[in-house]
């Protein structure tokens, strides 16, 4: 299930009732500010979905409309460009990763997409903390081009959460000592049955 609203979370009268009725082994949740200059609507609201993949992005590509978007559009297969409904840098990053997923596994698709972004952006900055899931695994990055990426934390068995739960979050949600800062240029791979995998990007 995917639930999106383009309104501030505190104005969403349905959220409390909805949240109390949800039960799952894996959740992705995002609360984001709108990007100045881009339309506010469902089409620009995360998480984005393609088939069984969900995608979220914390960051930006500077001057995306002038630099990133035209270059990414030259690369994308028609199938993935046609699936784009909004105009955010986030949705184009997702499409670029999906483009490379056609011939790679997800880890390699992320590496390939970030490598291409490094090439096409030149001296422009980009903050690329992304999270993807197919319902079985979560892939999360802390990464930046010509900048310092937003924070990312991993926590296991954190007080106040379900026993044996694992969390990947942008900000530590408590003063617990169980939170670990994820280093810059890292990819985390989390699954239900395996140990957390951390790879350098």
Give the ranges of each region predicted by the language model:
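Conserved short alpha-helical segments that host acidic/polar catalytic motifs at enzyme active sites
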Residues: 1-54, 62-201
């Amino acid at each position: 299930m995917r639930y999106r609203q383009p309104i501030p979370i505190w104005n969403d009268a349905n959220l409390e009732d909805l949240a109390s009725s949800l039960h799952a082994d894996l959740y992705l949740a995002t609360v984001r500010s709108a990007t100045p200059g881009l339309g506010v609507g469902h089409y620009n609201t995360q998480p984005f979905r393609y088939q069984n993949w969900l995608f979220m992005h914390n960051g930006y590509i500077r001057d995306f409309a002038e630099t990133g978007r035209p270059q990414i559009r030259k690369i994308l297969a028609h199938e993935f460009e046609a699936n784009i409904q909004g105009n955010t840098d986030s949705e184009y990053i997702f499409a670029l990763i999906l483009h490379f997923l056609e011939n790679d596994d997800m880890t390699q698709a992320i590496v390939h997409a970030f490598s291409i972004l490094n090439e096409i952006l030149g001296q422009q900055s980009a903050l690329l903390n992304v999270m993807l899931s197919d319902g079985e695994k979560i892939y999360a990055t802390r990464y930046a081009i010509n900048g310092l990426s937003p924070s990312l934390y991993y926590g296991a068995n954190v007080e106040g959460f379900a026993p044996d739960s694992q969390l990947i979050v942008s900000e530590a949600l408590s003063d617990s000592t169980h939170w670990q800062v994820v280093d810059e240029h890292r990819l985390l791979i989390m699954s239900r049955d395996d140990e957390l995998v951390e790879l350098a990007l």
